[in-house]
Structures are given as C-alpha cells and as structure tokens.
Amino acid sequence: MQDPNADTEWNDILRKKGILPPKESLKELEEEAEEEQRILQQSVVKTYEDMTLEELDDHEDEFNEEDERAIEMYRRQRLAEWKVTKLKNKFGEVLEISGKDYVQEVTKAGEGLWVILHLYKQGIPLCALINQHLSGLARKFPDVKFIKAISTTCIPNYPDRNLPTIFVYLEGDIKAQFIGPLVFGGMNLTRDELEWKLSESGAIMTDLEENPKKPIEDVLLSSVRRSALMKRDSDSEGD
C-alpha cells in the first residue's frame, strides 16, 4: 500500500482532488513539534517543582541536558530555601550545657548571635519556672540561642542566693544580666514579663506593645486611689 504522506506526483493529484487531506507544511510540523516539546518541558518542570532534593537526585538520569538545566535551577532554589528555613529554625529549644561547654557555646557562639544563659539549680521553684518560660520563648525566637546550666558547673561556689541568674550575650560579650529572685519579681513572673525584660536587652524582638508588668509606681498609685475611694464611701455611709 502506498504511503499517503509520501511526496509523490500521484499523492499530489489525490490531494488536489480532495481524496487525500492536505499535507502539512514542514514549518507547521516543526512548530507542532516545538509546542509539544514546550508542553513536555513545562510538565517536567512542574513535576520537579513538587519534588524534594532527594527525589531530584534520584531522577537526575531520566532527562536530557536541557531538562537537567531546568532541574538544576530548581534544585538550587530549593537548596537556598532549605538553608533559609534551617537558619531561621536554628535552635528552638533550651540547650543544657556544663562549664566545659561554655567557651564553645557562648564565647564562640557565632557572629551576630544572641545567647541567653540561665544559671539555675534543681529544687529552686523560681529557677524551674524560668526554665519553663524559656522553653516557650526558645520556640518563639528560634534564631536566639537559649541555654541553661547548673550554676556551680559554670561558676564554682556561685551562691544560691543569686539564683536564678540570666546573662545575655552578643558575640561573647555580656549585654545584660539579671541576678536574684527580686529582679524577676518572684513566683508571679509570667512568660510575657520575662519576654519583655529580655527584649529590653536587645536579644529578642518582642511583639508585645507594652510592658505587661505595671511599674511599682502605678501599682502604688492605684492602691492609694482605691483606699481613698473606700474611705470616702465609708464617710458617706457614716453621714
């Protein structure tokens, strides 16, 4: 049987008579092929956009050089995104250290890195409360390094009366220190209050709009006002 797509004089006559359909031009065929390749390329890229770095490595032998260039672009993009995510979520928890780790974890922590160190001891309720608050703050501010250590492992003979103690460092230098229970306000300390206190040192960027703990002056003034109102009401009832 004769090929209807062959370039023969007989086929040309049949096309003129309408017996055979018109033959597509070479240009049209090339355009169709390019369009098919473009669609295929898009589907390949779209598929690889959804893949992990490991999956990209597993399938790297399945495509030609042009495909590999597109895939390499997405691989680099995904790697950059992964590094940014990794950096933002560098910590996220309170690390336990001892004195031998101090230089590495604090002094050599890294350029531009804030470190918050809590010196504590087991059996001191306020220390336990602050450790609990710091765990929440570490999750909220994963770019800040929160660490804790039993006081005497870092500073021999450090007095218990100074506990809890928090030191705030930037590139190994102390930027703030909070020593003793009075500084923290005792067991009434809330996580927001601790967050605000640490934010004043510059270590964290709080989203709190104002100090959650009212200054002592405001508390005293409110107490005086309440006493005055109660006295006035009492005098009115006596009349």
UniProtKB/Swiss-Prot annotation:
Instruction: PTM N-acetylmethionine: list the residues.
Output: 1
Keyword line: Acetylation, Angiogenesis, Apoptosis, Chaperone, Cytoplasm, Endoplasmic reticulum, Host-virus interaction, Phosphoprotein
Q: Which Pfam families match?
A: Phosducin
Q: What is the recorded name of this protein?
A: Phosducin-like protein 3
Residue span, Phosducin domain: 32-180
Q: What is one GO cellular-component annotation here?
A: perinuclear region of cytoplasm
The family this protein is said to belong to: Belongs to the phosducin family.
Briefly state the modifications made to the protein after translation: N-terminal methionine acetylation destabilizes the protein.
Subunit relationships? Interacts (via thioredoxin fold region) with KDR/VEGFR2 (via juxtamembrane domain). Forms ternary complexes with the chaperonin CCT complex and actin substrate, leading to inhibition of actin folding. Interacts with XIAP (via BIR 3 and RING domain). Interacts with HSP90AA1 and HSP90AB1.
Q: Which domain of life is it from?
A: Eukaryota
Q: Where in the cell is it found?
A: Cytoplasm; Cytoplasm, Perinuclear region; Endoplasmic reticulum
Species of origin reads Pongo abelii
Segments of this protein annotated with the region Thioredoxin fold? 91-239
Q: Which residues carry this modification: Phosphoserine?
A: 43, 234, 236
